[in-house]
Amino acid sequence: MSVSPVSIVSTPVAVSASPAGAPDQPVQPVTVRWRGREAYEASFDAMRAFTDTRTADTGDEIWVVEHPPVYTLGQAGDPAHLLVADSGVPLVKVDRGGQITYHGPGQIVVYLLLDLRRRKLMVRALVTKIEEAVIETLAAYNLASVRKAGAPGIYVASGVHEGAKIAALGLKIRNGCSYHGLSLNVKMDLRPFLAINPCGYAGLETVDMASLEVAADWNDVAHTLVGRLIANLDGASAAADKPHALEQSND
């Protein structure tokens, strides 16, 4: 997978009006950074540093990456959910919510570095917007998917793989700002999921778009997903999908 580094800027919009009726200041545009294939630890360190050093004036960013094979275990995760100790895939303990998951080639990983206070956005509302973006993205490829109460992520709605997980979600909120994010399986080697209880659920089937007979290009799906995320987050049109919305970046 090869991705040219670009920065996509969404349209700034006012999120609400003040009690006196005067419009609030518009939310700053979201910058989208395409980081290509990157070691998990490098992304993890970078998003923590970004969050630790951001100020009230720092713009929000979305990072899109693809990782080499790695298991990540959430802050309160149980190591017992890694069923095969000598799988050859490294395990990294991280500070997001949730249990254990797998990242690898052929999977889109999106990190959301957002100032929730500035956006006047509660965590539950953010999760809903992310899940809606994934559902809308899959629908663009004629795949029906759903949420599950109490189990963040997105699941296949019907058919032979009904109930299988196709996208995972895990966030960390620090000082009113989010990092970590979501992963969507496009076309990947799914065998490493057999060595874990995905997200802490024993026997949970994990699939990708290819398993559902959709031959989708990683870049195309990633651009669709980013467009839906931006549209859901700030109310802008999904201009992020369109070539005129792309600007070259030095990232």
From Swiss-Prot:
- Can you supply one Gene Ontology CC term for this chain's record? cytoplasm
Site residues, Lowers pKa of active site Cys: 165
Is Transferase included in the keywords of this UniProt record? Answer: yes
Active-site residues, Swiss-Prot/TrEMBL? 199 (acyl-thioester intermediate)
The record places domain BPL/LPL catalytic at: 56-241
UniProt keyword annotations, A-Z: Acyltransferase, Cytoplasm, Transferase
What InterPro entries does the record tag this protein with?
A: aa-tRNA-synth_II/BPL/LPL, BPL_LPL_catalytic, Octanoyltransferase, Octanoyltransferase_CS
This protein is called what?
Answer: Octanoyltransferase
Q: Which gene encodes it?
A: lipB
